[in-house]
Structures are given as C-alpha cells and as structure tokens.
Amino acid sequence: MKLKKYATLALSAILALTALTGCGNQADNGDSKKTSGSSKITAKVIEIDLTDEEYAFGVDKEQEDLLKEVNDFIAEIKEDGTLDEICNNYFGDGTPQAVTSGTLDNSKDQLVVATNAAFEPFEYTQGDSYYGIDMEIASRLADKLGKELVIQNMDFDAVCLSVGQQKCDIAMAGLTIKEDRKEYVNFSNPYYSASQRLIVTSDNTDFDSCTDAASIEEILKAEDSSVKVGVQTGTTGQFYCCLLYTSDAADD
C-alpha cells in the first residue's frame, strides 16, 4: 500500500494555498471547481511533485512507552488493512466516521491529542464532531490503549509545542517529519507519503511545458510582485516558498 497526499500551492491572478488530497491515484482529471454566486472558478493541478515528504505523529519525549505503542499500532493498521479502510472513507466510497472528544480531566486515563482541525481530509470538524484520517486513527489508537480520547484543537504552530510542554501526549495534524520539530517531539514511524504540487486556474498555461520541479521553480522565481502565494503558517508549503524565494534573493 502506498498512500500519497498532495498539498498544493495554488497559482492564479492571486496565488492561494489549498489542499488537494489523493490516496494512491488521481481523482478525475485533476480539475476542481469553486462556485461563488453565479461565477465559477476552475482549477487544475500541475502533476509534478515539488517536494517529497512523510507524515508521522509527534509523541511527547517523556513518554517512550507511548512512542513504541504508537509505532506498533501504525505497523498493525498498515498490515491488517485498517489504514486503507480509513483512507477509503475520504478518498473512496467509504463514509467518514465522526469522532467525539472527551473533556480533559487529569484524574482520568486519557490520550490527549493536539491537532489543528482545519486540514481536510486529515482533520476537520462538523458541529461538535471531529472527522479526518488522523482523527479516526486517534480514535482507534485510544481504544487500543484503553484510554479516553481527548482532542485539543489549536493553531497549527502550537501543535508540536503543546506536546513538547507536556500539555498533550501526541500531535496528530498531518505533520511532515522536520528537524526543527524534533526539538519538541519524537516522531513516530511514518504512516503517509506526501508532496507539494502547484494548482492554477484552468486557463493558465504558464506551466504546461514544465517537466520537473526545476522548470516550475524557474517560472515561479521569474514572477513579479503581482503574483502572490498563499500558505498556511507553519506548514511545509510555507517553508518551501520561503526557501525558494530566499534562495532566489541570495542568488541575486
């Protein structure tokens, strides 16, 4: 089983960052539509990987036993098909399962999960319930450990920090394994492969002749200030863009 997720950099008259996800295959022809009133905005994905990443969970450094339990659980759900089943709820014909959070209570045996529930289909909310790949994994992990699940929803920048400060046990938020985050958490074994890709308006032909990441980056660096890139703070998309344009400035 190979899981692949594409977090895409979106390019239009104004660039914005969105998340496009897939599980081992491409959905339709890569086009998507957004409707605002009577107008339609159609987008397409440039099918070239700009980065290769792996997602993992960030565990409290003081809880070595929990790290082992998490790694064992990841291996188990990969082996028995549970991870495929969960992904199918979001990328296939399955039904997303609602996950309920308990209330934080230090007198109880709880698994406290730090997340940023604004990253569909990995974590998001509908009403009082949580949904997403990470949230369903969290629910099953808590059951496996015999603990009550408590989900702490916070800004993405605070997710790893809250675990590092022992306010939460584990970070489950579509986290790319990065060296700077290791200051706060011990990463589990990876459970998901990911990549950054560019998404543009369907009538944009600037990148049609591109064959690799270098050719895309050459065009991006040549854009003037009228073209803007929107990113979620603290994500790999932001780090990629900062590195790309910082490197460009250094070369000048």
Feature map (PLM): residue ranges:
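Conserved small/polar residues in nucleotide/adenosyl-binding loops
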Residues: 245-252
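Immediate post-signal peptide segment of exported/extracytoplasmic ligand-binding proteins
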Residues: 34-39, 95-130, 214-226
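Extracytoplasmic small-molecule ligand-binding "clamshell" domains
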Residues: 55, 65-73, 77-93, 105-175, ...
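Bacterial Sec-dependent N-terminal signal peptides
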Residues: 1-7
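Secondary-structure junction motif
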Residues: 207-213, 220, 228-244
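Bacterial signal peptide processing site
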Residues: 24-26
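C-terminal motif of bacterial Sec signal peptides marking the signal peptidase cleavage site
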Residues: 18-22
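Acidic, polar ligand-binding/catalytic clefts
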Residues: 40-51, 139, 143, 148-218
